[in-house]
């Protein structure tokens, strides 16, 4: 385990709630001040199938973009689905590689995970917490960006849902029920994410409404 629990909140995290809005648009959900946005999908996984992109899984039946909800592609009986409320490990590896080139503090990053999950590691439970929109209280961990995909559970593979470097150059945010992750930052960062061949990413806008699966009641 390399991510370490924070005993107190660093300024970039303690001030985070002041820089977030209280609405349901991408620009309000992620910190104000960033100018470009993307949505990255967790790949589809299921019994007997290899990981697939949403677009591949839809096979042309639905046009997949940054506004697509997973439930648009499948019915309730389907056992195939992307991971929910976490960042897929393969996606995390790619994101950490790309994001590293767009911050001055890649070894000094913060990772937030919802405190309501069962099975969290004992050291995670001892971390300081911060409140995000919609009453989401999040434990705060710190470490190198390359460790963002580290599991925060005693048994299981869930990783932190929010990432932010100490210089606040970008933000990665994923709600409790999200099957994807939103990213905000510079235009150069988002261009690099959209150009990556090993993740499924779509350009989002500040005014785009965060889709319903990201905020289930």
PLM region spans:
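Extended, low-hydrophobicity segments enriched in charged/polar residues
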Residues: 1-151
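N-terminal low-complexity, intrinsically disordered segments
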Residues: 64-69, 74-75, 158-172, 208-217
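Aromatic-enriched hydrophobic runs in primary sequence
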Residues: 100, 114, 119, 164, ...
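Amphipathic protein-protein interaction modules
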Residues: 132-189
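Alpha-helical oligomerization segments
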Residues: 174-217
